[in-house]
Each structure stands twice: as structure tokens, then as C-alpha cells.
Amino acid sequence: MANNLQKQLFAKKFKDAEEVLRTMDDQGNDAAPDTESDDLGELPAFGCGGIRPRRHASSMPVGDNDSWRKYFAVNEMFAIPERNFKFNTYYKLPQTTNAASIPVFIMHHGAGSSGLTFAPLADELYTRLEGKCGIFSFDARGHGETVPLDSTLEVPYDLATFTADFNAVIKTLQQRILQHKIPKEKLSIVLLGHSLGGSICTTAFNAMESALRSKVVGVAIFDIVEEAAIAALNNMSHHLATTPTSFATMREAIEYYIEKGLSNLRSSAEVCVPALFHKTSRGKAVRITDLASFQKYWHTWFVGLSSRFVHLPTSKLLVLAGSDNLDKELIIGQMQGKYQLVVFQESGHFIQEDAPAKAAITLIEFWRRNDNKNVVIKTNWGQWN
């Protein structure tokens, strides 16, 4: 019954969207995409086969603080005084810059998550691009190992603050590392955000310094739709009240996430779940992020997201774990070809953890189709027949 109701609502949204488009046409508005919007063609279509079998044995110690080493080369703190935080970062630089373009995927996780949520995806990207790329992820304020420089100061968690943090971290990454490791004419940045991280990416792009923004070839967001996200916030308090904040062991935490369907791949859960918890001296796993304390800022997180995303003056990719939750703004944008939409029907909310291989293939295709440094123009000029 719930599925039928969802389908009816979805059909109504399409009908409403079509009426809006007809009105726009009657008024003489151009329904074609902006010149700076996507012109991508079709990205890879994936079957609806089952998720890879879950592994029942871990290849690394549970809750091992060094588990990140399998996926990233460096774990470094970025101390940024103007943001009053030391940001815990993970990154991997290209093995070689012997290519026309070197993409750097800069990632932002969602609320209650951590930078290591992208670990499985990072591994897939780096492997498939044969080391000719950079990968960067980090823990946002209030998450993971990121900590305030001065803990006596108030710590806000509104969208504007998260966005300012993200841009400060990107600027630090560029000035401290990228400009010394990747020739500027080869650097291509893809911003990727999951859930709240997607909302942050849509605001961060326009707020970036122009020189750095010019290096961004596209913005990708994973499983986030404004209307659905705002509706979910209404149930957030109940969800938090019924979700354990601690477990007797880290193994118990991992098994809970798998059994509840919060993680669909055991291999991903082994690295992603421990990053959400602090391990006490007695082995107890205690959740790091207290989302309830963010409650007065929740209302800032998603309002206007769909419109911001659709109108970003760059290439855009939306990857969803199911298609029933598009809102009217996104439906109209999709009809007008404003962005690329890919749906992974078999994935859970954490697409980067549940379907890292498919997500990597999709991101690589998105980058290749939108990075003009990959275009090779062949000519016979000056050649004799």
C-alpha cells in the first residue's frame, strides 16, 4: 500500500511538472538547457541485479584506527584558525600526472557520517583510473576526528557554516598540496556530496574563489532531494530516540548496522561504521556525533536545495537510491535536461558504501564527458595525401 501511495504521489508530481512546462511554453520561455548546463548523453545503465554477497570475515581488525590505510595514502589534520577547527582529512594523490587531465574528487559526507564513508568509493575510483586521479575526503565539524581549536567558543552547525568550512578546507588543500603536485593546466575538480554533503556542495560551488571554481568540471550529489529530506527531518527526533548511541563492542556496532540494513556490504561496514564511534578504554563503542544537539540548525540544511542544484552554472549529476522521491523542481529540471540523473534501485541510502563500483563508473563517465581537457581534435591540416 505504501508503494502504491508513493507511485500515485510521484505520478501527480510529473503531472504538475508537465503543467508548469506547458505554461512556460505558452509564455514563450525557452525550455532548452542553459549553455553551461550538461550535454552529456546517456551515462552507463546498470541492471537491477542483487548487491554483491556480504563478506562474513573481516580483512582488518575491527575498529582499527589505521583501517583508512587500505583506501587512502595520507591522514592529515588541517588546522584552519579562521574556522576554529582542526579538520581530519584523508587523501590520495595521483601516482602520475602523465595525462591530459587529472581529476581530483573532493567529497563531503552527510550528517552523522564521516569522511571514511567514501573509502570504498575512493578505492574503486583510484583503481579504475589507474592512479591518475586524486581523492580527498574529510570529517566535517562535529563528526569523526575533527575537533575545535578553541572548545570554549560556540560551535554552530548551520548550512552556511558547513559551507564556509568546506571552502576553507578546499582552499587549504589547493594551496598546501594540489598546486605543488598537479600542473594547474591539468587539474580538474569534481565536487561530490552525499545527503547533507550534497546540499553543502551546491552552496559551496558559487561561494568558491573564481580561480578555484574555474577548475571545477562538475558537481555530483548522492541520494538527496529537498522535499524528501525536509520530510525526513520531521521524523529525525524519533529516529534518534530509537537508535542506540553506544554498543558493548565495535563488532556489535558493525553487526547492528548490517542487520538493520544501514550497511548492505560487509566490506564497507568494516571501515565505515567504526569511524562513527569512539572506542573507550574498555572496548565500548560510543557514537561521536550528537545529531540531537544540531536540531536548531536542521531547518537551514535543505531549504532551496533543488533550485540551487538545478541552476548551478556547471555540469551536474544526481544519483538516487530509488526514483520515487524526486520533487517538482527536480522533475522539471530533468525534463529540461538541466542535469544528469542516475538511479541505483538496489542500493541503500549510502550509495558510496553499498554500490562503490557502480558509483565509481558513473563518476568517471561524468568527469570524462564534461572535462574539455579530454577532448582530442584530430585534423589532417598540413598532411599530404
UniProtKB/Swiss-Prot annotation:
<dbReference type="InterPro" id="IPR016812">
    <property type="entry name" value="PPase_methylesterase_euk"/>
</dbReference>
<dbReference type="GO" id="GO:0005763">
    <property type="term" value="C:mitochondrial small ribosomal subunit"/>
</dbReference>
<protein>
    <recommendedName>
        <fullName>Protein phosphatase methylesterase 1</fullName>
        <ecNumber>3.1.1.89</ecNumber>
    </recommendedName>
</protein>
<dbReference type="InterPro" id="IPR000073">
    <property type="entry name" value="AB_hydrolase_1"/>
</dbReference>
<feature type="active site">
    <location>
        <position position="349"/>
    </location>
</feature>
<keyword id="KW-0378">Hydrolase</keyword>
<dbReference type="Pfam" id="PF12697">
    <property type="entry name" value="Abhydrolase_6"/>
</dbReference>
<dbReference type="GO" id="GO:0051722">
    <property type="term" value="F:protein C-terminal methylesterase activity"/>
</dbReference>
<comment type="similarity">
    <text>Belongs to the AB hydrolase superfamily.</text>
</comment>
<comment type="function">
    <text>Demethylates proteins that have been reversibly carboxymethylated. Demethylates the phosphatase PP2A catalytic subunit.</text>
</comment>
<feature type="active site">
    <location>
        <position position="195"/>
    </location>
</feature>
<feature type="active site">
    <location>
        <position position="223"/>
    </location>
</feature>
<keyword id="KW-0719">Serine esterase</keyword>
<dbReference type="InterPro" id="IPR029058">
    <property type="entry name" value="AB_hydrolase_fold"/>
</dbReference>
